A protein has these predicted regions:
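Residue-level signal for functionally critical sites in structured catalytic/ligand-binding pockets
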Residues: 12-17, 21-24, 28-36, 64, ...
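Hot-dog-fold acyl-thioester-processing enzymes
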Residues: 2-58, 114-135
Length: 135
C-alpha cells in the first residue's frame, strides 16, 4: 500500500465566481494540476512517456462539492491511485483546507497510443512508478 500524493495550492482571484467561491469547473483544473505534479514526481516527465509511444486521456471525471473554497485560501489536493487496470488508471482526489475535506472526486484516465491511437496497456515503467501511490 502506497502513500497519497499531496500538492499545495492557493485560490487566485480569477478562479472565483460572483459569490466569491471557487467556480465549480476549477476543481477539475486543481485535480489536473495535482495529477500532473504526481506524474512529475513519479516519472520525472510526462513527455518521456509520450516520447516512448504512450499517452493518456481523461475518460471520466466526477466532483462532489462539500464546502466552498474562497479567494486566497491555501489548500492541498491529495491524490491516491485507487485502481491500476490493464489500460486505465483511476485516481481518488480530495481537496483539503486545514485538514478538512472541502471537495472530493475521481478521475479515470485511459492509456492510448501517442498521437491519438487506440487504447494500449499501461507501460510497466509507469505501473511500477505509480504503485507507491496506490491504495
Amino acid at each position: 500500500m502506497g502513500e497519497p500524493f499531496r500538492h499545495s495550492l492557493r485560490v487566485r482571484y480569477n478562479e472565483c465566481d460572483p459569490q466569491n467561491a471557487v467556480f465549480n469547473a476549477n476543481y477539475l483544473m486543481y485535480f489536473d494540476i495535482a495529477v500532473s505534479e504526481l506524474w512529475r514526481e513519479a516519472l520525472g516527465s510526462y513527455d518521456s512517456m509520450v516520447d516512448s509511444g504512450t499517452d493518456m486521456v481523461v475518460a471520466e471525471a466526477k466532483v462532489r462539492y462539500l464546502t466552498p473554497l474562497r479567494f486566497d485560501d491555501d489548500f492541498d489536493v491529495v491524490v491516491t491511485v485507487s485502481k491500476l487496470g490493464t489500460t486505465s488508471m483511476t485516481s481518488a482526489l480530495a481537496v483539503e483546507r486545514n485538514g478538512d475535506v472541502v471537495a472530493e472526486g475521481t478521475l479515470r484516465h485511459v492509456f492510448i497510443e501517442a498521437g491519438g491511437g487506440g487504447k494500449t496497456p499501461i507501460p510497466e515503467r509507469v505501473r511500477k512508478a505509480l504503485e507507491s501511490y496506490t491504495a
